[in-house]
Amino acid sequence: MNVDTTSPQAPLAGVESKQDGASNEATAKAESTTHDQNESSSFDERPVHSALSERQRSALLAVASFAAAISPASTTTYYPAITTLANDLDVSITQINLSLPAYQIFQGLAPTVAAAFSDRFGRRPVYLVSLSINMAANLGLALQKNYASLMVLRCLQSSSSGGTVALGQAVMDDLITSEERGRYMAYLTLGLVMGPALGPLIGGLLSQYLGWRAIFWFLMILGGFFFLMVLTFFRETNRSIVGDGSVPPQKWNRSLVQIFRKDKLIANPESLAKKRISVNPLASIQILRNKENFIVCMYGALLFGGYASVISIFATQLEERYGYSQVQVGLCYLPFGVGSILSRWTAGKMIDWNFKREADKQGFKIVKNRQQDLSRYDIEKARLTVSFPMIFATCGFVVAYGWLMQYDTHVASVLVVVFLIANVFTGVLIANSALLNDLNPGNGAALGAAMNLTRCLMGAGGVAAVTPLINKIGIGYTATATAGVWVVTLPALYLVYSKGYTWRKAALEASSQDRRENPDVASGSP
C-alpha cells in the first residue's frame, strides 16, 4: 500500500502560506502608512509662502486694488463731461469720443513695460513712479485748453494708470497661494470694478456743480492720496527681493512705516527667488504664445469687452429713456459696485471651496499657506467647473438687461439685473484670473500685463461698436447678440477644461526629456 507522506504537510503549507500572506499584507500596510506619513511630512516641510499675517496681506491687496482703480476711474469719470468738453474746446462730440479708444489702447500697452520693470526692480518703486506720472498728467489735463493737448495728456494719463493693474496681479502672485486665490482675488478685482461703478457718479457731480476741470483735479488728488499710501504703508512684495516678506528690501525701497518701526519678522534668505528677472517688455507677449494662456486670456477679454460695452452705454440709455440727470445716472451705477463687492462672499468662497473639493477628489494634499506644485493637479477642472455656470448666468442677465431697457420697464427692475450682472461677472473674472495665476506661477506682473492688454483692446472694440449697433438694431438685440457671442465661443474654454491638463503634462514631459538629452544646456554649461 502506498502511503502519501506529503498529505499531512499540505495543511501546514497552507497555513504558512496564509501567515506569509498576512505578514506581507501587514508589511505593505506599514510601508504604505510610512509612505503617507513621509508624504505628509514633505508637504508640511515645504516653506511658508508668505511670512506676513492675513491682515497684512489683505491690507496690501486692498492698496493694490484701489491703486488699480485709478485706471478705470479715469475712464468713467470722464463720461459725464463729454458734451461739456466738446462745447468748451469747440470740437465735435465724435472727436472727443476718439479719446476713449485711444485711452484704452495705451491702457493695454503700457503695463507691458511697467510689469517688466517691477519684476526687475520691485513693485513699490514702479507704483510710485506710475502714480507720480499720473498726477502730472491730471494736472496738465485740468489746465489744458485745446483738443491736441487733451489727446496727448489722456494717453499719458492712461499709460501711467494702466501699469497699476498689472502690478496688482503681481502682488497677488507674490502673497497668495492657489488655495486662497478665490477670496483674495475678490479684493483685487474690487477696485477694478468699483472704478467704473463710482466713476460716473463722481464725474457727474463734479461736472454738474464745479465744471469738467474739477474731474481732473479730483483724479490728481486721488493719485496723490494713493502715492502717500504706497510711500507710507506699502511694503515691497517682489519675491526676488524680499522672499516670503521676511527679508528686508534695499533701504531706499522701504516704506516709511518700515523705516521708523522695526520689523519683527525673522529674515529667511532661503525664501528668495533663485534669480532676479531681467527687464523684458515682451514677457507678456511670450505668455500669450502658450495656447492654454491664449485661450483663457482671449475668452476673458471677450467677456470683458461685452461687460465694458454694457457699462459704457448705461449712462446714455438712462438719460434717453428715463430723462435722468448726471447725478441720477451716477447713482444708478452703484448696483455695479455693490454686486462686485458681494462677489467676495459669494463667488470667491465658492471658487476656494471647489478648489479644495476637486483636490480631495484627485488625492491632492493641500497645506495652508504652502504653495504646492500644481503640475500634477488638474487645476483647469477646479477653476472652470465654477466658471461655466456663472458664464451662462451672466449671459442670461445681460439678455434680460437689454430687453428690460428696450421696453422701458421700471428702472428698479433694471437696477436689480445690473446688480446680478456685476456680481456674477466679477465671479467669472475672479475664476479666470485665478486660473491664469495658477498656470503661470512667479509671472504675476507679465501675466497682469497680458490680461490687461487683451482686455483693453477688446474693451476698446466693444465700446466703439456698441453704440452704432444699438442705433441699428436696438439694445435688446444688441444684448442678445453679445450673450450669443459668449455662448458660441464657449467651446474654446471647454477645450481648456477637457484638454488643458493633458497639454500641461505633455509639455512637462517634453521639457524633462529635453533636459535629460541636453544636460549641458539644462545646467547652463558652455
From Swiss-Prot:
Q: Where is this region: Disordered?
A: 1-49
Sorted UniProt keywords: Glycoprotein, Membrane, Transmembrane, Transmembrane helix, Transport
**PROSITE patterns attached here?**
MFS, SUGAR_TRANSPORT_1
Compartments annotated for it: namely: Membrane
Record-linked Pfam families: MFS_1
Q: Which domain of life is it from?
A: Eukaryota
> What's one GO BP annotation on this UniProt entry?
export across plasma membrane
**Any one Gene Ontology molecular-function term assigned to this protein's record:** transmembrane transporter activity
Q: Where is the composition biased (Basic and acidic residues)?
A: 32-49
Q: How does it sit in the membrane?
A: Multi-pass membrane protein
Q: Where are the transmembrane segments?
A: 59-79, 126-143, 186-206, 214-234, 294-314, 322-342, 384-404, 411-431, 446-466, 473-493
Attached carbohydrates are found at 38, 97, 238, 253
Q: What's any one GO cellular component for it?
A: plasma membrane
Biological role stated in the UniProt entry = MFS-type transporter; part of the gene cluster that mediates the biosynthesis of squalestatin S1 (SQS1, also known as zaragozic acid A), a heavily oxidized fungal polyketide that offers potent cholesterol lowering activity by targeting squalene synthase (SS).
Per the record, the similarity remark reads: Belongs to the major facilitator superfamily.
From the Swiss-Prot or TrEMBL record, give the protein name: MFS-type transporter clz19
Organismal lineage: Eukaryota, Fungi, Dikarya, Ascomycota, Pezizomycotina
